[in-house]
Amino acid sequence: MAPPPNTYSESWWGGKEERGTPVVVKMDNPYSLVEIDGPGMAAPSEKARGKNAKQLTWVLLLRAHRAVGCVAWLAAGFWAVLGAVNRRVRRSRDADAEPDAEASGRGRAMLRFLRGFLLLSLAMLAFETVAHLKGWHFPRSAAGLPEKYLRRLPEHLQHLPEHLRRHLPEHLRMPEKEEIEGWLHRAYVAWLAFRIDYIAWAIQKLSGFCIALFMVQSVDRLVLCLGCFWIKLRGIKPVADTSISNDDIEATAGDGGGYFPMVLIQMPMCNEKEVYETSISHVCQIDWPRERMLVQVLDDSDDETCQMLIKAEVTKWSQRGVNIIYRHRLNRTGYKAGNLKSAMSCDYVRDYEFVAIFDADFQPNPDFLKLTVPHFKGNPELGLVQARWSFVNKDENLLTRLQNINLCFHFEVEQQVNGVYLSFFGFNGTAGVWRIKALEDSGGWMERTTVEDMDIAVRAHLNGWKFIFLNDVKVLCELPESYQAYRKQQHRWHSGPMQLFRLCLPAVFKSKISTWKKANLVMLFFLLRKLILPFYSFTLFCVILPLTMFVPEAELPIWVICYVPVIMSVLNILPAPKSFPFVIPYLLFENTMSVTKFNAMVSGLFQLGSSYEWVVTKKAGRTSSESDILALAEAADADARPPPAKLHRGVSEGGLKEWAKLHKEQEDATAAAAAAAAPGTPVKKSKAAKAPNRIFKKELALAFLLLTAATRSLLSAQGLHFYFLLFQGVTFLAVGLDLIGEQVS
């Protein structure tokens, strides 16, 4: 029998009920429908009306306050942008004092071309606007004329081929002689005839060629994505040999047995004061027998303060028992390749079997060598094991987010697919382990290009060495946070391959590798992905598309402008699914970067001076959250050892004294120079400041060109073309004003 209901608990709303006892509330009439103006509807009182009116007033006031706040926020943001633009325009001359390909004579040709193109487009826009206002685009009584008359072509256009006649606008009708009014109208008619006879077909032919290249490159990208999908589906990945032989036990008897070959770690750096300490700290904490590992810090810095700091950091870790040495070249030639070549010439290098390379901003995990070196065991043809990059500042700003999309696709798709199916890919220059014999058989590091990593990879591939890419082994590093640093990095990355292509092409045909590998190296690795991609991207979207707005007889299909690029951008963003909201900004930004990549490709192909320039990418010195864990492990390890010499901020006591002395000398020299220049003026201590934001003239010229073309598209009522040109022009404008990356106030 059920217990009687607890009326007390029901009336008290569960306040005094027993813990865990549910409260059941029964409603006699759960669905009570009251008819409006019916007998059950009570008349609203004046008090309720006043209350509702007050509530409505407060809601409206709250929404009005939010609207005003939104408008004020937009106005403040717009004013801040205008202020930043004004400051950058005023500082542009000072910023241009830094060496740059754009400011030199060899870089002015493209800027002059873009300026001339812009001036011509503005003149054509003014001309077309006058013609549109006067109705010269249409017959005077177009509404009352039959359709067949509107489609009629003049006699001198009957000879046009069918594919050009098909692209002629339906409203085009050349006026008769008696309809021409004045010299301006006559000039416009002559311009119409000239662009149809001589310009339209040339633009149409060039656009067809670029569309064909675009489709070939799209198919290549689709095949790479399918290959990556198949690798994920089947779980294909390199497997290391973890077995332990008797030779391994004898060679590492003091380390408990295992496969621990002699490994040399090289850390090339140059004036990278922001990141040297973190990088050296991570490398020195790699889990490997210390007597079987040597760390070379290859310092090419010309800043004496930076040299002293790096030397002091090396001294600190040497006192802690790490086998580490500091090297500084007196003859600093050949950039990074010359630095590595000089380090490999040391006599003690012959005692080592493998060499791992880390740039100054890389932070390897302690198990890096244990995850990479075992792949060499039992695989004598393996020359390189490459790890994937991971980025500590990928969410810092919009620029780093877009870079993360690009590089995630590069590692997840390009490197992994080429490594699995071809056993060849371009060495990324860092976070990789080389077999020293492979380097020596391939001629070692060469200084002939600025992409020494790709150079050694191609030569090793021609000698028959195989590569492995480990997608699950990641090494933290930094992305450039400013557009200026990213632009210089991309210029070097795209000019060097074209320079290398010219140099190694004879060696490719003379090599003994298979014909298929030769074709892949020439057609896909160099031509399609290094030359064709920047060529068609710049030509199609930055030159031909604006031209078709002023020459409407030649047009680009909508699927070329919109649909296929969006699909390709979605494929690019799949390895980084969290970045999917940035698919449209990524597409627009990649088109913007085509200017820099095209310019770099041309300079490398024709061996212009800018292809030999090497600029060290600026670093911010950011670290990961894993640094805290490593610091705790370091502290625990330090407790088990006798206390070393007193350290301060990661430098030894002797190194700190030397640095302090040098720093004081520099301060005294600065104070003396300031006093001599302006006697009686107090001297302010200056901090190391970042380079200010600047304006980029090529991007600005293209921004105004695309916006002019967008305005012209309104006269032809081309809606989708207008929106694409508008957004692309605004993107060029934001990049040209350096509003996309790090903002230095």
UniProtKB/Swiss-Prot annotation:
Transmembrane is among the record's keywords: yes
GO molecular function: glycosyltransferase activity
Presence of keyword Membrane: yes
One Pfam family from the record: Glyco_trans_2_3
InterPro entries membership: Glyco_trans_2-like (IPR001173), Nucleotide-diphossugar_trans (IPR029044)
Enzyme active site: 300, 453
GO cellular component entries: Golgi apparatus; Golgi membrane
Membrane-spanning ranges: 116-136, 196-216, 531-551, 556-576, 695-715, 720-740
Record keywords, A-Z: Cell wall biogenesis/degradation, Glycosyltransferase, Golgi apparatus, Membrane, Transferase, Transmembrane, Transmembrane helix
Membrane topology: Multi-pass membrane protein
Location in the cell: Golgi apparatus membrane
Residues noted as binding substrate in the record, renumbered to the chain: 359, 361
Any one Gene Ontology BP term: cell wall organization
Domain of life of the native organism: Eukaryota
Top class in the EC scheme: transferase
Similarity-based family: Belongs to the glycosyltransferase 2 family. Plant cellulose synthase-like C subfamily.
Function summary: Probable beta-1,4-glucan synthase rather involved in the synthesis of the xyloglucan backbone than cellulose. Seems to work simultaneously with xyloglucan 6-xylosyltransferase. Xyloglucan is a noncellulosic polysaccharides of plant cell wall and consists of a glucan backbone substituted by xylose, galactose and fucose.
Protein name in the entry: Probable xyloglucan glycosyltransferase 3
Organism: Oryza sativa subsp. japonica (Rice)
Record gene name: CSLC3
